[in-house]
């Protein structure tokens, strides 16, 4: 299987944007990625850690606490509205680096 041409940030954004309420738990993000990209279903090594790393360090992703009437584990993750246009029109492909950058 070939690795999809998307960054981890793009995979996370796709997952969040696919959700009816535009927010998902970490576990739901994993399920989306593995369910839509067989490469990640077969490859256990490290991709989940990379997803967590991106959620924590990328300012485009905001952690949102669960409502009191929403049982379960973990917070939700949402896309910062300022970052949504980065992924408009399904533009999730990796940006190619130009020579000299």
Swiss-Prot record:
Molecular function in Gene Ontology: DNA-binding transcription factor activity; DNA-binding transcription factor activity, RNA polymerase II-specific; RNA polymerase II cis-regulatory region sequence-specific DNA binding
InterPro entries in the record: Fork_head_dom (IPR001766), FOX_domain-containing (IPR050211), TF_fork_head_CS_1 (IPR018122), TF_fork_head_CS_2 (IPR030456), WH-like_DNA-bd_sf (IPR036388), WH_DNA-bd_sf (IPR036390)
Tissue occurrence: Low levels in lung and liver.
GO-annotated cellular components: nucleus
DNA-binding residues (ranges): 2-93
A GO BP entry: anatomical structure morphogenesis
Signal peptide: none
Broad class of where this protein is predominantly found: nucleus
Intracellular or extracellular location(s): Nucleus
Name of this chain's protein: Forkhead box protein I2
Organism name: Rattus norvegicus
């Amino acid at each position: 299987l070939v690795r999809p041409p998307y960054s981890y940030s793009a995979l996370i954004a796709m997952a969040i944007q696919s959700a009816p309420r535009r927010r998902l738990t970490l576990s739901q993000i994993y399920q989306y990625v593995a369910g839509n990209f067989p490469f990640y279903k077969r490859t256990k090594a490290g991709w989940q850690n990379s997803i967590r790393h991106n959620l924590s360090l990328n300012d485009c992703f905001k952690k949102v606490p669960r409502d009191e009437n929403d049982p379960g584990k973990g917070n939700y993750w949402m896309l910062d509205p300022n970052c949504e246009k980065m992924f408009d029109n399904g533009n999730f492909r990796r940006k190619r680096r130009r020579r000299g950058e």
